[in-house]
Curated annotation (Swiss-Prot):
InterPro entries, per database record: Ribosomal_uS10, Ribosomal_uS10_dom, Ribosomal_uS10_dom_sf
Gene3D superfamilies: Ribosomal protein S10 domain
Listed HAMAP family: Ribosomal_uS10 (MF_00508)
UniProt keywords, alphabetically: Ribonucleoprotein, Ribosomal protein
Record protein name field: Small ribosomal subunit protein uS10
Reported function: Involved in the binding of tRNA to the ribosomes.
SUPFAM superfamilies for the chain: Ribosomal protein S10 (SSF54999)
Sequence similarity: Belongs to the universal ribosomal protein uS10 family.
Annotated GO MF terms: structural constituent of ribosome; tRNA binding
Gene Ontology CC: one annotated term: ribonucleoprotein complex
GO biological process, one term: translation
Subunit structure: Part of the 30S ribosomal subunit.
The keyword Protein biosynthesis is assigned to this record: no
Length: 106
């Protein structure tokens, strides 16, 4: 029987409406992981979610006249293998934009 070494992994999921802010945040996270000698894999792009809202243009009549709005949620995943305590501290102190939603799973 071979012994499998359990490898620690941090999975970071990022979501944002603005793709450029999301990519900048991914670059900062990967750069921080590389500086602390951890291995970062990613950013792995996930499918973009589109939410479409249909609104009547007129407040009273003309149901045939409608307007469509949409929001696009861009998502990325970054995996960090063999993190040290220094890596986790550096990631906690990282200053990221407020428009980016971050989920960290250990």
């Amino acid at each position: 029987m071979s012994t499998a070494i359990a490898q620690q992994k941090i999975r970071i999921r990022l979501k944002a409406f603005d793709r450029r802010m999301l990519d900048l945040s991914c670059d900062k996270i990967i750069e921080t992981a590389d500086q602390t000698a951890a291995t970062a894999i990613g950013p792995i792009p996930l499918p973009t979610k589109r939410k479409i809202y249909c609104v009547l243009r007129s407040p009273h009549v003309d149901k045939d006249s409608r307007e469509h709005f949409e929001t696009r949620t861009h998502r990325r995943i970054i995996d960090i293998y063999s993190p040290s305590a220094k890596t986790i501290d550096a990631l906690m102190k990282l200053d990221l934009p407020s428009g980016v939603d971050i989920e960290v799973k250990l």
